């Protein structure tokens, strides 16, 4: 059998712990997985397939063991079945997340059917992890429902057996039950019937046939009362031909062996059963003449004459002085003897027991209790009693005892105390009613996990390099290398025994910081804040506009960034340092709506003059004022058709309605007719003074012969306006930006901390935000000259780039607290600046900012590979002159000198002189 927790469980608990959420497991699954065994369970740490799952059931009960341990229980009733399973899993059903997988030998689950009792199964899973009670929200104590009735049921069975034992003794057989008879040759039969052996009832329904291969022998019944797989109890009987004592088999079941008969070498059977003297015998009428009669059951009877060796019929006698061994005493003889005994008793009581020290010979039976007020002493013989080899028994209101003495010296005493405790020589004897307590009764308890044989988990104080801690456990490091930062840390290591999947979780002592990293078998990853990778680099996230500088983000405004400062973002954007511009606004766009209710953020176009102010809609106000100089100059759309700008038309220009220039002509006469007669049909037109005509008398020869009706004449056609076919909708303008309440930011980096006073990532982000802010302020300042604007921007950008470049190149390669000796840094320093952070006291810390003196050395690139050794580097600080007492003569100079020796490998540094200072950290740039 094997059980494992899953990686999903560990992540789930960690996530809920960080989020202060709730850990929930609500269902058990039972599956039958082919080939599953305890050695390959690690290959099955996912929820089995639906074809393999044979049963699913909600958690029946859950309870608390202690603050860090909870137990989940499920009971499958007898109405469920039939199926086999070898896998049990505890899951979170909504998340489809497997927490614990258990491999077990194949178990059969049988339900009730056809009057055959099924089996019920209870399975419990205990989960232990930090804060389990608080995380799961379970408050019920497991003691209220984790009850095992096995002992109780077994006790009931044992009580019934002991009751039968009290009634029937060791064994009793009724009538011919289990009577052994010879059939022929070595073939024998055992007759059916009932019997009791040590209180266990034996039932033989039919005649049993037995072969005795070797004679002589004896026949024994071997009986055991035990439970079947369904919980049903049955009695099993087998027959032996060799003697065997009562025994307990490999299944821890008690067997009782009772002799039935002896068979001699000729096959003759001697009945050895213990027959009941009063149970099961059918009463028959017998007298002194009964002999060789056969009853209806086939029994034959021959009454023997009673003797001192054999039961039978006998004569009676009233004599009190007879020594006959063939006659029985009558009541009269007994009465006479009784009277004499009373007389003797009276005499004896006056003589025996008054002074004690009498010796009473022979076996005596006492019908009532024996009470000894000074205890009771028992010895095997008078000789042993005289030698004070005694077993003394006694009791009082506090306890009872059995004491063994040898030569009047106490060897040992067993006591039963009034509170139920047992002891031997005043040392407790533990039992089911008085179990030992771990804290008070067990001595010499180990105080380490190793003391309990647990070698794959450690709890200890550590030191040195954190990279070396790969064994599961909890460690405390006051200082060391490769910690997340300076200070004291608690390191939790989780690996499950794997060497290529090691997780370290670091919690800073007396702080809330939590960082984590992993080891893949070759390298350690960088330390990161726990839960800090929720938003991937490059993700676009919206924040309320009130959030002006979220840590880890750059505003998505189309600007560029320094790729050395944000290398991860640069790679994510496809090797580009251009941020997306998501500052676009939709204010000022127009749209038609087919409803009367205008959506939020829009206003009717013709309400601009009355509703748009700098306070209400500042962005739209600015756009319109920039275009039309004043809100009152914004044209009204009214009932106009909207045209596109171009072809001489400008935005905001309005036009009256108009029809392209054209004429309609009506013929009035034929100017080219030879008779020059006027052609005018009064039936087709009207005679009206408003009908203008052009005749041959005017100068415009091309329109001669036509007339032009006026608009107010009946000949005018059309409506009140010129228009195409139309659909009337509501023209509106966007007055408020859709994303007016939010700003878009790009995830640029996780929390990147440099030990010391600077946070490079946040500083770079703040510098970029400062640049944008200043640019905005300059833009708003209409009185600043273009030269001032450009100079200010250039100055800020230059400083920003200098800070970015400087910070991006600094890297910590060692941390510690030494003033002499050798230091090994984590990276070669050839061609770089070596920066040592010094303090005058060993107890000072860099994060105290107390008396920090940085010293830097330039390590030339030409040193790498140099033959003959490394290079000696020195620096001189604080040259102090010393004058004579009168101050007239300079007699010396005090110099603070710092010197180191860099080895040819570029990573070994020998401290030569630090002027009694201590180096706390080394950076390279």
From Swiss-Prot:
State where it is primarily located: virion
Give a single Pfam family match. Collar
- Provide the leader sequence positions: none
Q: Which cysteines are joined by disulfide bonds?
A: none
| A single GO BP | virion attachment to host cell
One cellular-component annotation, GO: virus tail, fiber
Keyword tags: Host-virus interaction, Late protein, Viral attachment to host cell, Viral tail fiber protein, Viral tail protein, Virion, Virus entry into host cell
The keyword Disulfide bond appears for this protein: no
- Tell where it localizes: Virion
This chain's function reads: Probable tail fiber that mediates the attachment to the host cell.
Give the protein family: To phage P22 protein H.
| Protein's name according to its UniProt entry | Probable tail fiber protein
Q: Which organism is it from?
A: Haemophilus phage HP1 (strain HP1c1) (Bacteriophage HP1)
